Protein backbone atom coordinates (compact mmCIF):
# COMPACT_ATOMS: atom_id res chain seq x y z
CA UNK A 1 0.00 0.00 0.00
CA UNK A 2 1.42 3.33 -1.05
CA UNK A 3 1.53 5.93 1.68
CA UNK A 4 0.80 9.52 0.82
CA UNK A 5 0.71 12.75 2.71
CA UNK A 6 -0.65 16.22 2.30
CA UNK A 7 1.57 19.24 2.76
CA UNK A 8 0.41 22.65 3.81
CA UNK A 9 2.26 25.49 2.11
CA UNK A 10 0.42 28.58 3.29
CA UNK A 11 1.31 28.37 6.97
CA UNK A 12 3.23 30.41 9.53
CA UNK A 13 4.69 29.39 12.89
CA UNK A 14 4.16 31.98 15.62
CA UNK A 15 6.54 31.60 18.56
CA UNK A 16 6.41 33.52 21.84
CA UNK A 17 9.15 33.34 24.49
CA UNK A 18 7.50 34.51 27.70
CA UNK A 19 7.90 34.46 31.46
CA UNK A 20 7.19 31.18 33.19
CA UNK A 21 3.47 30.77 33.84
CA UNK A 22 2.39 32.96 30.92
CA UNK A 23 2.06 30.07 28.48
CA UNK A 24 -1.30 29.03 29.88
CA UNK A 25 -2.57 32.62 29.59
CA UNK A 26 -1.67 32.54 25.89
CA UNK A 27 -3.27 29.16 25.23
CA UNK A 28 -6.44 30.29 27.00
CA UNK A 29 -6.55 33.41 24.81
CA UNK A 30 -6.09 31.24 21.72
CA UNK A 31 -8.83 28.84 22.81
CA UNK A 32 -11.22 31.79 23.10
CA UNK A 33 -10.84 32.38 19.35
CA UNK A 34 -10.92 28.69 18.40
CA UNK A 35 -7.19 27.94 18.11
CA UNK A 36 -6.61 24.57 19.79
CA UNK A 37 -3.22 23.37 18.59
CA UNK A 38 -0.58 25.29 20.50
CA UNK A 39 2.48 23.80 22.18
CA UNK A 40 4.21 24.99 25.37
CA UNK A 41 7.66 23.92 26.50
CA UNK A 42 9.98 25.12 29.24
CA UNK A 43 13.18 27.00 28.51
CA UNK A 44 16.01 28.66 30.38
CA UNK A 45 17.11 32.13 29.35
CA UNK A 46 20.75 33.19 29.40
CA UNK A 47 22.42 36.51 28.74
CA UNK A 48 22.11 39.61 30.90
CA UNK A 49 21.68 37.52 34.04
CA UNK A 50 25.21 36.16 33.73
CA UNK A 51 26.71 39.60 33.05
CA UNK A 52 25.19 41.05 36.22
CA UNK A 53 27.11 38.67 38.48
CA UNK A 54 25.61 38.48 41.99
CA UNK A 55 22.80 40.89 41.04
CA UNK A 56 21.73 38.45 38.33
CA UNK A 57 20.27 36.13 40.98
CA UNK A 58 17.25 38.46 41.12
CA UNK A 59 16.45 37.87 37.44
CA UNK A 60 14.24 34.85 36.76
CA UNK A 61 15.73 32.83 33.90
CA UNK A 62 12.77 30.45 33.63
CA UNK A 63 10.84 30.93 30.39
CA UNK A 64 8.10 29.23 28.42
CA UNK A 65 8.07 28.94 24.66
CA UNK A 66 4.62 28.85 23.06
CA UNK A 67 4.36 27.78 19.43
CA UNK A 68 1.31 27.70 17.20
CA UNK A 69 1.05 26.99 13.47
CA UNK A 70 -1.58 29.09 11.71
CA UNK A 71 -2.80 29.84 8.22
CA UNK A 72 -0.83 32.74 6.76
CA UNK A 73 -3.99 34.80 6.30
CA UNK A 74 -4.65 34.61 10.07
CA UNK A 75 -1.17 35.65 11.24
CA UNK A 76 -1.86 39.31 12.04
CA UNK A 77 -4.99 38.59 14.08
CA UNK A 78 -3.43 35.76 16.09
CA UNK A 79 -0.08 37.54 16.50
CA UNK A 80 -1.87 40.53 18.04
CA UNK A 81 -3.94 38.25 20.28
CA UNK A 82 -0.81 36.59 21.68
CA UNK A 83 1.01 39.92 22.06
CA UNK A 84 -1.82 41.39 24.12
CA UNK A 85 -2.46 38.24 26.20
CA UNK A 86 1.23 37.96 27.10
CA UNK A 87 1.51 41.71 27.83
CA UNK A 88 4.56 41.94 25.61
CA UNK A 89 4.29 45.73 25.63
CA UNK A 90 5.67 45.58 29.20
CA UNK A 91 9.50 45.49 29.46
CA UNK A 92 10.90 42.10 30.44
CA UNK A 93 7.77 40.07 29.62
CA UNK A 94 9.28 38.38 26.58
CA UNK A 95 9.26 38.53 22.80
CA UNK A 96 7.64 36.82 19.85
CA UNK A 97 8.19 36.26 16.15
CA UNK A 98 6.51 34.70 13.13
CA UNK A 99 8.27 32.30 10.76
CA UNK A 100 6.83 31.50 7.31
CA UNK A 101 6.82 27.73 6.78
CA UNK A 102 7.83 26.31 3.41
CA UNK A 103 6.03 23.05 4.12
CA UNK A 104 4.16 21.47 6.99
CA UNK A 105 2.67 17.98 7.05
CA UNK A 106 0.13 16.29 9.28
CA UNK A 107 -2.90 14.06 8.94
CA UNK A 108 -5.75 15.80 7.17
CA UNK A 109 -9.13 13.99 7.31
CA UNK A 110 -10.53 12.95 3.89
CA UNK A 111 -13.63 15.10 4.48
CA UNK A 112 -11.42 18.20 4.67
CA UNK A 113 -9.34 17.17 1.65
CA UNK A 114 -12.44 16.68 -0.50
CA UNK A 115 -13.78 20.06 0.58
CA UNK A 116 -10.69 21.81 -0.78
CA UNK A 117 -9.97 19.54 -3.76
CA UNK A 118 -9.45 21.50 -6.95
CA UNK A 119 -8.73 24.84 -5.29
Locations of the language-model features?
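Positively charged, small/polar-rich N-terminal and surface patches that mediate targeting and assembly
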Residues: 1-119
